[in-house]
Design a protein with these regions (language model features):
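A short, conserved alpha-helical patch in the ABC ATPase nucleotide-binding domain
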Residues: 95, 99-100
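ABC-family ATPase nucleotide-binding domain "signature/switch" substructure
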Residues: 45-50, 74-83, 91-94, 108-116, ...
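Extreme N-terminal "head/tail" segments of very large remodeling/mechanoenzyme assemblies
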Residues: 1-42
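Short flexible coil/turn linkers enriched for glycine and charged/polar residues
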Residues: 2, 13-14, 26, 52, ...
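Conserved ABC transporter NBD signature motif
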Residues: 56-63, 73
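Conserved coupling/switch loops of ABC nucleotide-binding domains, chiefly the family-specific signature
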Residues: 54-57, 210
Length: 238
C-alpha cells in the first residue's frame, strides 16, 4: 500500500497546498529533507491520521484516507522515530513486540539484521536482560537499534523513519544506517531528516520549505536544478 496522491491543505501552521503523485511509484525510498519547522513531520502526521486535513484529500490505494479506519491504516505503517519507545521488560520482549507470534529465531534474526545482536550477547542475561522503563539503562544508539530490530519483525508494507540517526555518535550512526538499509528493503519508505548522508539512495526526494513542497525529484535531478536542495546538500558536504 502506498499513497497514490496526496493533497495537503492548510492546517494550523502548515499552510502549503501541494499535490504529490505516487501513482506510478512502487516500493521505494522517499526522503523529505528541509529545515526544522518546515513541515516535514506534518506530512507524517497526515499519513498516520493523527489529524485530518481541513481541505484537499489524501488517497491510499485509491481510497480517500478518511474513509480508512485509523487502526487499519496504522497497521500498514511501521515507524522508527527520533524519540524511541521501549517498555519495562526483557530485550526479547521489546523486540518481539513488533509482531505477535514471532518465533525466537525470528527475533534473533531481526536483531542481527539491526546490528544489535552482538551487543545483546554482551548483556548479563542476553536476550533475557530486563530493560528499565523506556530503556534508560542503555544508550540512545542502542535503543534506536532495538527499535529498528522491532520494526524488522513487522509485516507492514510502509515504513516511516523520522530523524532516526539524530543524537548518536558517528560509529553508531553507521550501524543505524546499515540497519535501516536492511529494514527498507522491499518497502515504501518515508525518511524524514536534515542530514542527507543517504540521500542518493532515495527514489524520490520531496523538499519541504516553509510548509510547501518546493522541489521533488531524484538526487541527481535536484542537484542539476541548483535550487534549495542543491544548496542544502552542498552546505552539508563542503
Amino acid at each position: 500500500m502506498i499513497p497514490q496522491r496526496l493533497v495537503m491543505s492548510a492546517f494550523g501552521s502548515y499552510a502549503g497546498r501541494e499535490e504529490i503523485d505516487f501513482s506510478q511509484a512502487g516500493p521505494g525510498i522517499f526522503l523529505v529533507p528541509g529545515a526544522t519547522g518546515a513541515g516535514k513531520t506534518t506530512v507524517i502526521n497526515l499519513l498516520m491520521r493523527f489529524y485530518d486535513i481541513d481541505r484537499g484529500a489524501i488517497y491510499v490505494d485509491g481510497n480517500e484516507i478518511r474513509q480508512v479506519t485509523r487502526d487499519s491504516l496504522r497497521l500498514s505503517y511501521t515507524m522508527v522515530l527520533q524519540e524511541t519507545w521501549l517498555f519495562c521488560g526483557t530485550v526479547y520482549e521489546n523486540i518481539a513486540y513488533g509482531r505477535i507470534g514471532a518465533t525466537r529465531e525470528e527475533v534473533i534474526a531481526a536483531a542481527k539484521a539491526a546490528r544489535i545482536h552482538s551487543y545483546i550477547e554482551t548483556l548479563p542475561d542476553g536476550y533475557n536482560t530486563v530493560l528499565s522503563d523506556d530503556g534508560v539503562n542503555i544508550s540512545k544508539g542502542q535503543k534506536q537499534l532495538l527499535t529498528i530490530a522491532r520494526a524488522m519483525l513487522s509485516d507492514s508494507p510502509m515504513l516511516i523513519l523520522d530523524e532516526a540517526t539524530s543524537n548518536v555518535d558517528s560509529r553508531t550512526e553507521i550501524l543505524i544506517g546499515e540497519a535501516m538499509n536492511e529494514l527498507m528493503k522491499g518497502r515504501t519508505c518515508f525518511v524524514i531528516a536534515h542530514r542527507l548522508s543517504t540521500i542518493q539512495n532515495a527514489d524520490r526526494i520531496l523538499v519541504i520549505r516553509n510548509g510547501n513542497i518546493e522541489e521533488q525529484g531524484t538526487h541527481d535531478e535536484l542537484m542539476r536544478a541548483k535550487g534549495f536542495y542543491a544548496s542544502l546538500y552542498n552546505a552539508q558536504f563542503e
